[in-house]
Amino acid sequence: MNSILKVSTFALILLIAGTAVKAQINTLSPKEKKEGWKLLFDGKTSTGWRSARAETFPAAANGWRIKDGVLTIQSSNGAESQNAGDIVTVGEYGAFELNFDFKLTRGANSGVKYFVTLKENSGASAIGLEYQILDDDVHPDAKLGRDGNRTLASLYDLKTSNKAGAVKPVGQWNTGKVIVRPDNHVEHWLNGVKVLEYERKSPAYRELVKMSKHKIWKDFGEADKGHILLQDHGNEVSYRNIKIREF
């Protein structure tokens, strides 16, 4: 009888814990509201988001899916922006702190871009500074670029993240953060660890751009404001708890 009671009690604890975690997803605490945080994804609808190539949210079959409080780009055989395509916030942002949870599948590639202006005729994917989302162990992009600057949490093709010990395994939720200060100081964070920082618009930043694939774009990453973008790179990647506050 005691063992049955223990099992039942444990099951009840797990159920309560799971319900509590689910209730906290895509919500703001009173403290966060007071601090000026706003949800960019409400967990139920595509409100506040649109296609990077159209004024409406993409309706492609097997594209962006909203289910159980999670926004997922579904797999389309690794083709970059060839199915649903990238999505961007309707609003534009300058100085801000952006938080987001992401979950990779094996070999997946995606990205969270910022200061996206949508003015460049860039082909598949819209142009902007990118917090790289990647399965470094499997996806070949991790070995391209320079000194690992295309790996997870890096400033894509520009600066490598120092994330040793901060990464949770593929299939688990990780938390990313991008902080852009009014003085153009930028930081990338992963699971509570600062993994890189740089000064946007600085001579050092512009030297990094000159050595990258972004050098073809005039004043790359230097817009005063831009959209936040979630990338469709043809692999299944999920997002939730996307929130922002402006400085």
Describe every region a protein language model picked out.
Residues 1-9:
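Bacterial N-terminal signal peptides that target proteins for export
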Residues 8-17:
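Bacterial N-terminal signal peptides
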Residues 21-247:
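Carbohydrate-interacting regions of secretory-pathway proteins
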Residues 2, 13, 22-25:
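Intrinsically disordered, low-complexity regions
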